[in-house]
Amino acid sequence: MALIVKKPKGTEDIVPSKVYKWHTVEKIVSEAAEIYGFKEIRVPTFEETGLFVRSVGETTDVVQKEMYSVSAAGDSKFTLRPEGTSGTMRAVLENGIMNEGLPQKVYYILSFFRHENTQKGRLREFHQFGCEMVGSESPRADAEVISLAKSVLD
């Protein structure tokens, strides 16, 4: 009997007949973000585990129960990204993007990974759009992000 390999529980295949829908959504989101002055950023699929422990919180369910982590040579430990803000902020700081002036506006459309109980609408690998406005404490910044979200949904 042949061994049948199936996709992991909580993941989905985006087959050729469905990819066009993804491209359409990604285009709408990207164009809206760029109209508002956001620039796309792409961060690694995995980061040092400590980044998420510090930013998300050591006692949160995400860190305690839901992260996919692996140990590497030495004392290194890496985690598949469970959310986007931590890696995005690390990249903004590490690459000196804030030195280009404030506020800095970045967006991402990425895959994320959490070991959760699967159910309709909740997968272990999921896709998310996010935007970060760095260096502005103004309520106008929040209003701008809300306006961006509304324009995507319209």
Per-segment meaning from a language model:
Residues M1-D154:
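TRNA-recognition modules of translation machinery and tRNA-sensing kinases, especially anticodon-binding
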